[in-house]
Amino acid sequence: RNNYRHVVGVSKRFNPNLMKDNKNQSSAGQIAKLPLFHRTPAFMWKPGEEWGNVNFAIWYVRIRERKYTATPYSGILKIEKMLMTGKEAENGLESDEIDMITANIINERNPVCYGNDARWANHLYPVYMTECYCKSRFKSDISFINLF
């Protein structure tokens, strides 16, 4: 379990209606209107036994200017971090840690792969390069079909 202490999950596609505010209303509008390089407040997700009784801190950050993206949610990433210590599980993450994680994610947004992939606005460069490498190792559709 301690191996996940410094692991952060980043989602390029997500359902914005799942994040609720204090009044249990959808935060989708707040997420869509995020200014460039701003983040939402983090919230604690407690999935229960199904997920090993591990809580998560979840927040959203805009990494691309909205006027250059195809949809209101393009250019926004969902960030998740497992809350590993008892203090974190009880109180959540400190804002300073969330800000540091967010700043590091923002720093990984360049260079841009614009035009190479329809999801370009949500790419983090190291992840994009890893995906490209992995895909380059796949057999082409024609080669795969000819195996049968």
What are the residue ranges of the model-derived segments?
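Long, contiguous domain-sized segments
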Residues: 1-148
